[in-house]
Amino acid sequence: AMRVEMGAPITMSRNAQTDAALGHLESFIDALEKLQDRVTLANGDVMVREPIGVCGLITPWNWPVNQIVLKVLPALATGCTCVLKPSEHTPISAMIYAEIIDEAGYPPGVFNLINGEGPIVGSAMSQHHDIQMMSFTGSVRGGTAVTRDAAQTVKRVTLELGGKSPNLVFADCNLEERILASVAECMYNTGQSCDAPTRLLVEKSCYDEVLKIAKQAADNIAVGNPEDEGPHIGPLFDEIQ
């Protein structure tokens, strides 16, 4: 589905996107095994953990399966119900996930899937009186809108927003090792990740050498057909990117 929806190479989709989702699943299982409903604090007070209620979940297009698992699983595992709105650009992965949830035997209404454009559906979810919490992954502009709309009903909000993550490069490091790793990480998923190190802040004395290594590394990145196996990257998602 990711190959068709966003042009992610089949190898990367299987080995990174799907593998990351499985990693989240294993981590949540470990956490749940240790989770206690009642915890006695050092001062004698008792902390009681209870389900929040209905959670509104908005996921992005760039890591669709990973983000769906990251939001839906902990909500359901802790006794919450949820409404998932995937990116309108990558709805197929969410639809497949909904089928899996249904086949697993979850009662109707525990997991709900709604599709539509972010500014319209996302705003309606964020303002809805029956949703107690919003979780959003996407742009800073989108996160700002969710926070503003959720404030009308004093919802809890969690955000994971995109940015321009810098790498600091000093002259005394192993320049080739560091720059090759930075360029590879930046180009991963065709540069379409929230944590892509899209900036290098370089010490002036090694600037020319860093530029040379970075250019060579970028030139060596292969772009290929998403249907083909291999370490190449795929196309950009759309013209805006």
Residue ranges and their predicted role:
Residues 1-4, 37-41, 193-195, 226-230:
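Short coil/turn segments at secondary-structure boundaries
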Residues 3, 14, 26, 126-127, ...:
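Alpha-helix boundary recognition
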Residues 8-17, 45, 113-115:
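Short loop-beta-helix segment that forms the pyridoxal 5′-phosphate
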Residues 10-35, 241:
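Long amphipathic alpha-helix in the N-terminal Rossmann-like dinucleotide-binding domain
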Residues 37-177, 230:
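Rossmann-like NAD(P) dinucleotide-binding subdomain of oxidoreductase/dehydrogenase enzymes
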Residues 133, 141-241:
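ALDH superfamily catalytic-core signature
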